[in-house]
Swiss-Prot record:
GO CC annotation, single: membrane
Gene: DNA-U4
Record's protein name: Protein U4
Species the sequence originates in: Milk vetch dwarf virus (isolate N)
Topology term for the membrane: Single-pass membrane protein
Protein family (similarity comment): Belongs to the nanovirus U4 protein family.
Subcellular location: Membrane
Transmembrane annotation, as ranges: 5-25
Record carries keyword Membrane: yes
Keywords: Membrane, Transmembrane, Transmembrane helix
């Protein structure tokens, strides 16, 4: 008798409040999709971008030698750190600024 009672009560709820059942089904589907894609959604909201533009990839591949404008002491220091194999444009600028600030504090 218990399964019949549960089925009857479920049908009664569906009959009286179909919007509740509809909301429950939509909530279940939305929760499943969020749980499935949580990592990708987290990255999207943290970076405020949905996709990386392809122009950045083209810009990085166009550079022939990223170490072309570096001073010899900077390249020597990068070799000691093991960073002389590949650098992106932003990393190169950051390391140049860092090296300049280090050399300025050394001179003072």
């Amino acid at each position: 008798m218990e399964p019949r009672f549960l089925l009857f009560s479920l049908l009664f709820v569906v009959f009286l409040q179909p919007a509740l059942v509809f909301n429950m089904v939509l909530g279940y589907i939305l929760g499943y999709l969020i749980k499935k894609n949580y990592a990708r959604l987290k990255v999207m909201f943290l970076t405020n971008t949905f996709e990386q533009p392809e122009e950045d990839d083209i810009h990085v591949s166009d550079e022939k030698n990223p170490f072309e404008g570096i001073d010899p002491d900077v390249s020597k220091h990068l070799k000691t750190l093991g960073l002389d194999t590949s650098l992106d444009g932003e990393d190169l600028e950051y390391l140049q600024r860092f090296w300049e600030s280090m050399s300025n504090t050394k001179k003072k």
